[in-house]
């Protein structure tokens, strides 16, 4: 029996690794071509967020979440960013860098790492669920934004986190939470995307079993699990082969640094989550839905489906972009976030615009 299971495990790993290698070859070719061109982000300080004001928010079950903050503590609006699967808050690097100047003192931005990701603490594998992530977001909001209007921005699993929060805390929306952006995300499990095929791989099942029931042996499944998921994640990240090599290296490091227990632990959550009831709550407020038309992990059909259910949504499909659209096409994403804030807080933005015009006139 054990021999048969081992054979199935190896065959499954080889089969999915072959699928992954096809994607990996396309990435390797693209990266090779990219390195021959000028890199617009050579020398970029991707550690910018690490220098911002630092806090730790401890969840009710005792997990320390790393938090960064930029902007005045008394800003009229707070924008909270939730990153995606196998990433960390740095995935919003360009939003942090550019929107700080765009919004100035009128907006405070808060970023945090999910449990098991980045600089946040580890957690039991049975807490690696989308519902738990929604509760973690509530813990961050309770400490970092206890008063005043808030806009939530979620990328990939971070978008699912926002949806989970909306399902569990619907009374927060329309009153405290005045706008939401869902970037490269989905309201229900991603079993219909290429990621869904990966989730059924015996290699990942073995790693998931080790994480849950034999954590001391998880290192034995590390290589097989990464060989299955890694190439797919890398291939799906960017749609344009002209993407900056520095940006590619930055995102790949985030993925590589994610603990294997986190990687396999959250995969099942991505497959089975269903936050479609949250769409009824989000229908009350302005929303932004963004997706690249070359996103292989959360294809644009997921975004289009959410937009149909949200009458106050702006749907932005970015041509040629992959799953990490906020790193690949930051200007388009940033502009869309500015529009969302303007729609979510129109009265405040009118006053802000008037003050800026008066200031410019006085200095003219």
Listing of model-derived features with the role each one plays in the protein:
Residues 84-88, 155-157, 186:
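Active-site glycine-rich loops that stabilize anionic/oxyanionic intermediates
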Residues 216-281:
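Conserved alpha/beta-hydrolase catalytic His-Asp/Glu region
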């Amino acid at each position: 029996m054990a021999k048969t299971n081992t054979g199935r495990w190896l065959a499954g790993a080889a089969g999915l690794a072959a699928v992954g290698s096809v994607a990996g070859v396309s990435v390797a070719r693209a990266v090779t071509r990219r390195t021959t061109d000028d890199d617009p982000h050579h020398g970029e300080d991707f550690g910018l967020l690490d220098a911002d004001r630092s806090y730790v928010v401890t969840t009710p079950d005792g997990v320390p979440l790393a938090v960064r903050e930029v902007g005045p503590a008394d800003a009229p609006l707070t924008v909270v960013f939730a990153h995606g699967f196998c990433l960390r808050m740095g995935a919003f690097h360009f939003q942090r860098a550019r929107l700080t100047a765009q919004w100035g003192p009128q907006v405070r931005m808060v970023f945090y790492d999910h449990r098991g990701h980045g600089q946040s603490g580890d957690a039991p594998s049975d807490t690696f669920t989308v519902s738990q992530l929604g509760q973690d977001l509530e813990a961050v909001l309770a400490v970092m934004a206890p008063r005043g209007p808030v806009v939530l921005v979620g990328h990939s699993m971070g978008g699912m986190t926002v949806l989970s929060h909306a399902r569990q805390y619907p009374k927060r929306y329309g009153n405290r939470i005045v706008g939401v952006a869902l970037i490269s995300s989905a309201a229900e499990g991603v079993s219909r995307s290429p990621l869904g095929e990966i989730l059924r791989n015996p290699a990942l099942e073995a790693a998931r079993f080790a994480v849950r029931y034999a954590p001391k042996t998880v290192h034995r499944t590390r290589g097989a699990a990464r060989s299955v998921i890694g190439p797919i994640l890398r291939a799906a990240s960017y749609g344009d082969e002209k993407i900056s090599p520095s940006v590619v290296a930055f995102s790949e490091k985030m993925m590589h640094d994610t603990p294997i227990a986190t990687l396999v632990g959250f995969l099942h959550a991505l497959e089975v989550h269903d936050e479609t009831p949250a769409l009824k709550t989000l229908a009350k407020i302005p929303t932004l839905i963004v997706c690249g038309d070359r996103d292989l992990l959360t294809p644009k059909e997921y975004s289009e489906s959410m937009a149909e259910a949200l009458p106050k949504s702006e749907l932005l499909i970015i041509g040629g972009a992959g799953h990490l659209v906020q790193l690949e096409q930051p200007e388009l994403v940033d502009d869309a976030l500015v529009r969302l804030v303007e729609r979510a807080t129109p009265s405040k933005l009118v006053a802000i615009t008037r003050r800026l015009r008066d200031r410019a006139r006085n200095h003219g």
